[in-house]
Curated annotation (Swiss-Prot):
Gene designation: NECI
Catalytic activity: 2 superoxide + 2 H(+) = H2O2 + O2
Glycan attachment residues as annotated in the record: 60
Superkingdom to which the source organism belongs: Eukaryota
Protein name per UniProt: Nectarin-1
Domain Cupin type-1: 69-217
């Protein structure tokens, strides 16, 4: 009986160890935004015609593939929203391919806004370099989580949730954004709905927002799709 008791305890310990290892494995995949790397480097071949989930590796690479000055200077904010996003993702820094990280810089004129949007492939953390911002995100239970953030402060936007930043100050503001994806993707809510190509049907938007089709057409005129040649 004693031997049976010892064997039973050993079995239980092994069972717990296996469950623990499984939990770690599951946890790793739950929190990873991108697939893990399988080699030291895989510099993206941005011109390859091969279609994969990500980018294929190019054979020859240099230090230039791992560096960029893209976010070193303020961007122009003279647009309808008074803000501009400058990215440093795999499309600007090919060496980021398979590494699961990227950055962006966002500049805001006084009164400027980065309209409600989502990043379907990444969570985002912003660090305020200059000015102050009113920021927030909305949960799937329609709860608004918001606050004013100041120079030197960070704020996190969970993956996939609608969020925004607004500069209500009298001076320009700027942040650096960090993402846990080499290419987080962005869907701006107003542009997605009212500037899609082909366009979202007027009756769909009218019924969704409880407005008439004339109002829909007026809003669409402000978000006309950019023609690509």
């Amino acid at each position: 009986m004693a031997a049976f008791g010892i064997n039973s305890k050993i079995f239980q310990s092994m069972e717990m160890a296996i469950l623990f290892l499984l939990a770690i494995s599951i946890d790793r995949y739950c929190f990873a935004a991108d697939e893990d790397m399988l080699q030291d480097v895989c510099v993206a071949d941005l011109h390859s015609k091969v279609k994969v989930n990500g980018f294929p590796c190019k054979t020859n690479f240099t230090a230039a593939d791992f560096s960029s000055l893209a976010i070193s200077k303020p961007g122009a904010t003279n647009n309808k929203f008074g803000s501009v996003v400058t990215t440093a993702n795999v499309e600007q820094v090919p060496g980021l391919n398979t590494l699961g990280v990227s950055l962006a810089r966002i500049d805001y004129a006084p009164g400027g806004i980065n309209p409600p949007h989502t990043h379907p492939r990444a969570s985002e953390m912003v660090f305020v370099m200059e000015g102050e911002l009113d920021v927030g995100f909305i949960t799937t239970a329609n709860v608004l989580v918001s606050k004013k953030i100041i120079k030197g402060e960070v704020f996190v936007f969970p993956r996939g949730l609608v969020h925004f930043q607004k500069n209500n100050g009298e001076v320009p503001a700027a942040v650096i954004s960090a993402f846990n994806s080499q290419l987080p993707g962005t869907q701006s809510i107003p542009i997605t709905l009212f500037g899609a190509s082909p366009p979202v049907p007027d009756d769909v938007l009218a019924q969704t927002f409880q407005i008439n089709t004339e109002d829909v057409q007026q809003i669409k005129s402000k978000f006309a799709p950019v023609k690509k040649f």
